[in-house]
């Protein structure tokens, strides 16, 4: 008998660049900095994409959208996440829930949590109660504490399409 539920973990980090806004969780946060990257730098979408793909055994974001491909330069990370969700569905899986921890000194996540949850829930095809975004600081330690960038850890559960419970 095959498993009806799987779990995946995703991680991403980006250094900060000058100029805003900062794109996180599919929304723009007013800021004088942004997450530098080959795409739009949305570390939340990147970590969630990897968590989902990993749970389903479908590779990772770097395989789907290599940074060596010029077509991915500046790409909207929500589009990447939507593609991962489509791949998940094609393989017989659906999103169960997603739990996200953003490790950063700035920006503060709390004021933007509801908008991120709503945006991500729409993209993932789940209720907003199935998406949670937490913000944590690094207590001033290391590169995150020095406000050089941020890190994101995401955990996702996926369920076999057609299953409602375990």
UniProtKB/Swiss-Prot annotation:
Entry-linked Pfam families: YgbB
Pathway field: Isoprenoid biosynthesis; isopentenyl diphosphate biosynthesis via DXP pathway; isopentenyl diphosphate from 1-deoxy-D-xylulose 5-phosphate: step 4/6
Enzymatic class: lyase
Binding annotation for 4-CDP-2-C-methyl-D-erythritol 2-phosphate: 12-14, 38-39, 60-62, 65-69, 146
Residue numbers binding a divalent metal cation: 12, 14, 46
Keywords for this protein: Isoprene biosynthesis, Lyase, Metal-binding
Cofactor note: Binds 1 divalent metal cation per subunit.
GO molecular function terms attached to this record: 2-C-methyl-D-erythritol 2,4-cyclodiphosphate synthase activity; metal ion binding
InterPro entries: MECDP_synthase, MECDP_synthase_CS, MECDP_synthase_sf
UniProt record, GO biological process: isopentenyl diphosphate biosynthetic process, methylerythritol 4-phosphate pathway; terpenoid biosynthetic process
Catalytic activity from the UniProt record: 4-CDP-2-C-methyl-D-erythritol 2-phosphate = 2-C-methyl-D-erythritol 2,4-cyclic diphosphate + CMP
Entry's EC annotation: 4.6.1.12
Cofactor(s) of this protein: a divalent metal cation
Site description Transition state stabilizer, residues in chain: 38, 137
The family this protein is said to belong to: Belongs to the IspF family.
Known partners and oligomeric status: Homotrimer.
Function: Involved in the biosynthesis of isopentenyl diphosphate (IPP) and dimethylallyl diphosphate (DMAPP), two major building blocks of isoprenoid compounds. Catalyzes the conversion of 4-diphosphocytidyl-2-C-methyl-D-erythritol 2-phosphate (CDP-ME2P) to 2-C-methyl-D-erythritol 2,4-cyclodiphosphate (ME-CPP) with a corresponding release of cytidine 5-monophosphate (CMP).
Protein name: 2-C-methyl-D-erythritol 2,4-cyclodiphosphate synthase
Species in which this protein is naturally found: Gemmatimonas aurantiaca (strain DSM 14586 / JCM 11422 / NBRC 100505 / T-27)
Designated gene of the protein: ispF
């Amino acid at each position: 008998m095959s498993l009806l539920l799987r779990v995946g973990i995703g991680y991403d980090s980006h250094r900060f660049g000058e100029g805003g806004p900062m794109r996180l969780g599919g929304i723009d946060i007013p800021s004088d900095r942004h997450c530098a990257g080959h795409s739009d730098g949305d570390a939340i979408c990147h970590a969630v994409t990897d968590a989902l793909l990993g749970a389903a055994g479908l590779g990772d974001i770097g395989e789907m959208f290599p940074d060596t491909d010029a077509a991915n330069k500046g790409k909207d990370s929500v589009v990447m996440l939507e593609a991962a969700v489509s791949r998940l569905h094609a393989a017989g899986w659906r999103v169960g829930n997603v739990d996200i921890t953003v490790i950063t000194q700035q920006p503060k996540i709390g004021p933007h949590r509801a908008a991120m949850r709503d945006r991500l829930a729409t993209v993932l095809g789940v209720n907003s109660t199935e998406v949670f975004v937490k913000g944590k600081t690094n207590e001033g330690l290391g590169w995150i504490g020095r406000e050089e960038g941020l890190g994101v850890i995401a955990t996702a559960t996926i369920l076999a399409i057609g299953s409602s419970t375990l």
